[in-house]
Curated annotation (Swiss-Prot):
Full protein name: Alkanesulfonate monooxygenase
Record flagged with keyword Lyase: no
Reactions that this protein is recorded to catalyse: an alkanesulfonate + FMNH2 + O2 = an aldehyde + FMN + sulfite + H2O + 2 H(+)
Any GO molecular function: alkanesulfonate monooxygenase activity
Pfam families: Bac_luciferase
Gene: ssuD
Length: 382
């Protein structure tokens, strides 16, 4: 099975280390453009753009980067409860048309009650999923050419429709991640690709089985993806040293403060991430080559695959054997790590290439020509 590999735009900040301004860099439009263009050239299928009050607006970032990229797809956040589903569908269709069919959408229900209250959303966890289900039914329906009437508990629309359809039919693909039962049911009924954060394979297998069974009861099939950081180096020893350096500036006080902030979240996925590391820098390898260090201070995806190219590829293939076909990866700092992933990891994967990308097993630069006319030996592939 060919794998789809996406990268990540760090609109909330970037740098060499977690928890310190040392080695940090300004994340402005020029820098985001560098990352997007690198991902485009290197053969990543798309980029995830995060959402939340700590991030730049994902829609505006995507719109600004579409003209300076050629094939790259942009996975943009949909926020039920924050915007009308009909307006969101119109925006989605416009972005899809103007990008030439390069728009993907990520349904985000939110997990921080404090942030959600600041955005005017005062719903419980269960109510947010009720509202998200109503939102998604309308959003998918109008994008698919239907005229939608819905009198829901949270949303009511009459005669909702679009005049200008999206390029991707019946609608641009809808991604979604969540770990609660309500999230699994929403995924089974409404979404095209279910994303999980990087838990050990056995836990991921359980989630996939549950979503797959629920989808079957709705007469549907769902694709699966996983969101992971990655630390890949020429040797596994170098990769683990890089992991240690990434959290080398974190002290117990910083970790405790971050974990206290994350503890207010009602996200089941966030609770599962926290359980992997327990707020401690000890015993962070929670599964072979799966490291939970990022989650000590970062909300959301908190685990990384660590190793040399063949080792990380082998772990990815273990997830693929469970049914995962899409990997959304990231690494610090994101510009440099995009090249490391392309050069050290891509040769060991069967990649689904974006349209128009051709290469000799990898899209990254093949090296300097020797003696004016001799091409370097091709990298070993597994």
């Amino acid at each position: 099975m060919s794998l789809n590999v996406f990268w990540f735009l760090p609109t909330h900040g970037d740098g060499h280390y977690l928890g310190t301004a040392e080695g940090a860099r300004a994340v402005d439009h020029a820098y985001l453009q560098q990352i997007a263009q690198a991902a485009d050239r290197l053969g990543f299928g798309g980029v995830l753009i995060p959402t939340g009050r700590s991030c730049e607006d994902s829609w505006l970032v995507a719109a600004s980067l579409i003209p300076v990229t050629r094939r790259l797809k942009f996975l943009v956040a949909l926020r039920p409860g924050i915007i009308s589903p009909t307006v969101a569908a119109r925006q989605a269709a416009t972005l899809d048309r103007l990008s030439g069919g390069r728009a993907l959408f990520n349904l985000v229900t939110g997990g921080d009650p404090e942030e959600l209250a600041g955005e005017g959303l005062h719903l419980s966890h269960a109510e947010r999923y009720e509202a998200a289900t109503e939102f998604t039914r309308i959003w998918r329906g109008v994008l698919s050419g239907e005229t939608v009437d819905l009198q829901g508990k949270h949303i009511q629309v009459e005669g909702a429709r679009l005049l200008f359809p999206p390029l991707q039919q019946p609608h641009p693909p809808l991604y979604f991640g969540g770990s609660s039962e309500a999230a699994h049911e929403l995924a089974a009924e409404q979404v095209d690709l279910y994303l999980t954060w990087g838990e050990p394979p056995a836990a991921v297998a359980e989630k996939i089985a549950d979503v797959r069974a629920r989808a079957a009861r709705h007469g549907r099939t769902v694709r699966f993806g996983i969101r992971l950081h990655v630390i890949v180096r020429e040797t596994t020893e170098e990769a683990w040293e890089a992991a240690d350096r990434l959290i080398g500036h974190l002290d117990d006080e910083t970790i405790a403060k971050a974990q206290a902030s994350l503890a207010r979240f009602d996200s089941v996925g966030q609770q599962r991430m926290a359980a992997l590391h327990g707020g401690s820098k000890e015993n962070l390898e929670v599964s072979p080559n799966l490291w939970a260090g990022v989650g000590l201070v970062r909300g959301g995806a908190g685990t990384a695959l660590v190793g040399d190219g063949p080792t990380v590829a082998a772990r990815m293939k273990e997830y693929a054997a469970l049914g995962i076909d899409t990997f959304v990866l990231s690494g610090y700092p994101h510009l440099e790590e995009s090249y490391r992933v392309a050069e050290l990891l891509f040769p060991h994967l069967d990649l689904a290439r974006p349209a128009g990308v051709e290469g000799r097993g990898q899209v990254s630069p093949f090296g300097e020509v020797l003696a004016n006319d001799i091409l370097p030996k091709a990298a070993a592939q597994s």
